[in-house]
A protein has these predicted regions:
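Positively charged n-region of N-terminal signal peptides that target proteins for export
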Residues: 1-11
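Active-site- and interface-proximal helix/loop "cap" or "latch" segments in soluble metabolic
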Residues: 27, 32-236
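A broadly tuned, weak detector of single residues within folded domains
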Residues: 6, 16, 218-219
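Sec-dependent signal peptide cleavage junction
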Residues: 15-29
């Protein structure tokens, strides 16, 4: 009889512990392409079905860091940069996680026959790139050796590299937009139907959102991308 009571008590304690874990704060993370050609990481902390905090960061792609001059380890290409044709020296070979990229004059960075942007359609590959950047694990091949001092988190993470640090008139800049977006999600979750309807159009800026009575406080034109990566994290 005592043995049965001990077993029953152990089961009750285990169930209670599992219930406490389930009710406690959970950090959820999702990755995806944002702002057309960046990898975003959305993180939410959920407790009791509600969001207690949210954060966003972005990693630039390997094209963001180029060499100052041509060498045996670079490929020189003419590309469009903010509407103007410019010549850039891209690093020929870049490695991260289990993926090796080679720069192609026609398709840009590729892994085998797969273009980088097609590779990043899979969340797992977005995670590999983002976390490699964040941990300073991206290698650039220089003179046959792996160099991890070129494509660093300081150069590629928007939270560190000063991206859009000086906003234009009536804009917030990267950091303030990120904070406004996260504050909106924490306050409102993902149930605002009028916001969803506008988001479905595929383009969303603060003026359009305000016109429908949903004020996010953000001013970036790709609000939908950041909203969706946070939503994907919440739904995991």
């Amino acid at each position: 009889m005592k043995k049965i009571l001990v077993i029953a008590l152990a089961v009750v304690m285990m169930v209670s512990a599992l219930a406490l874990v389930a009710c406690g704060p959970q950090e959820k993370v999702a990755y995806g392409i944002v702002h057309k050609s960046y990898v975003g990481k959305g993180t939410v902390v959920v407790a009791g079905g509600k969001i207690s905090s949210a954060s966003i960061d972005e990693a630039c792609l390997p094209t963001y860091v180029v060499a100052s001059e041509a060498s045996a380890d670079t490929v020189t290409a003419t590309v469009l940069d903010h509407g103007a044709e410019v010549q850039k020296h891209f690093y020929k070979t870049v490695k991260f996680a289990d993926i090796t990229l080679e720069y192609d004059l026609t398709d840009g960075y590729k892994s085998g026959s797969t273009k980088l942007m097609d590779l990043l359609k899979e969340e797992a590959n977005c995670e590999k790139w983002f976390e490699a950047v964040a941990s300073d694990s991206v290698s650039v091949m220089i003179a046959g050796k792996e160099d991890k001092t070129i494509m660093t988190s300081a150069k590629l993470l928007k939270s560190k590299n000063g991206y859009w640090g000086t906003p234009a008139e009536n804009a917030l800049g990267w950091k303030a937009n990120m904070e406004a977006t996260c504050a909106y999600v924490v306050a409102n979750g993902f149930a605002a139907e009028s916001f969803e309807q506008v988001a479905g159009e595929g383009k969303l800026d603060n003026e359009k959102v305000d016109n429908l009575g949903v004020h996010t406080g953000a001013t970036w034109t790709d609000m939908l991308d950041y909203y969706n990566v946070l939503k994907a994290a919440f739904n995991k």
